[in-house]
A protein has these predicted regions:
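Helix-loop segment at the mouth of the active site in Rossmann-fold oxidoreductases
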Residues: 9, 93-94, 111
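Conserved Class I S-adenosyl-L-methionine
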Residues: 49, 170-266
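Conserved catalytic/acceptor-binding region of the Class I
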Residues: 117, 122-124, 128-203
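A short SAM/SAH-binding and catalytic strip from SAM-dependent methyltransferases
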Residues: 100-115, 139
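Conserved class I S-adenosyl-L-methionine
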Residues: 1-41, 49-53, 75
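Class I SAM-dependent methyltransferase SAM/SAH-binding core
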Residues: 39-95, 101, 118
Length: 266
């Protein structure tokens, strides 16, 4: 699933919540109509957790995966040594033959603002007739977990203020279901779009920080020195404690909306 700042992804950090991160892949694959594909590609395969779901579902298919992160690919190769993995970039992806299933778990949100529909529709060109593009993305930029990142980043006179202003790390919400429909439907025999909000159970508020350290928090803390990073995370944590109340047993529920799309080519 790695695409942004490709050299700083940590497979170990991402894998701390691997069961929760894998569940959307299982839910997405359940809606893919292709029962016996010959060629399957996992776009942004991460440490191979989503690829393992594909291997279980399609034991007779030729399955491959790619990711921009060398560390993610290293972990994927360790996990699934019989699958072809490579370090590659989605924007330059061009398979040598049509693919039956293009699968992607939590990657397309990292595509450049304004080019997402263009890139996604271009992927349809790589499908065999009747093939499916299936992808899932976090749809949570307006959730407190992510809004708080931006609020802390925008605070004036902080050790991180100038660094993050220069980093220009703003990211827009992925296009809406109606925009996705208009972009993809002319290319599809069938188009299925839905949204699910998962309720992830965190041990405490620090658990939310650990979750987002593996993904959405990275662009904010990676450019900072250790002292600025520590203070940024402490300030961010205080905002989380105000936004998410602890349950009676001390656990914290993290609502996590995700958008799913299965586009089947005519």
């Amino acid at each position: 699933m790695a695409q942004a700042n490709k050299d700083t992804w940590s497979a170990d950090q991402y894998s701390k919540f691997l069961k929760d991160r894998t569940r959307p892949s299982i839910d997405l694959l359940a809606h893919v109509p292709n029962l016996s594909p010959k060629r399957v590609v996992d776009i942004g395969c991460g440490p191979g957790n989503s690829t393992a779901v594909l291997v279980d579902q399609y034991p007779n298919a030729k399955i491959s995966g790619f990711d921009t992160s060398p560390d993610m690919i290293r972990k994927a190769k360790e996990t699934l040594p019989n699958v072809d993995f490579e370090v590659a970039d989605l924007q330059s992806f061009k398979p040598d033959a049509p693919v039956d299933v293009l699968f992607s778990n939590a990657v397309f949100q990292w595509l450049p603002n304004g080019k997402r529909i263009e890139i996604v529709t271009r992927l349809m060109d790589h499908l065999a007739p009747g093939g499916s593009l299936a992808f899932q993305i976090p749809y949570n930029l307006n959730e407190p977990s992510h809004a708080s990142m931006r609020e802390v980043a925008g605070m004036p006179n902080k050790p991180w203020s100038e660094t993050l202003k220069r980093a220009n790390i703003s990211r827009d919400q992925f296009p809406s279901p109606t925009e996705i429909w208009d972009g993809l439907k002319p290319l599809c025999a069938d188009l299925d779009i839905w949204q699910t909000t998962y309720m992830h159970v965190m041990e405490n508020h620090e658990g939310i920080v650990e979750w987002v350290k593996g993904t959405g928090l990275r662009p904010y803390v990676d450019p900072l020195d250790e002292n600025a990073k520590k203070e940024y995370i402490e300030t961010y944590l205080e905002k989380l404690k105000k936004a998410y109340r602890a349950q009676n047993d001390g656990k914290v529920l993290l609502p996590f909306p995700r958008l799913f799309v299965v586009a089947t080519k005519a």
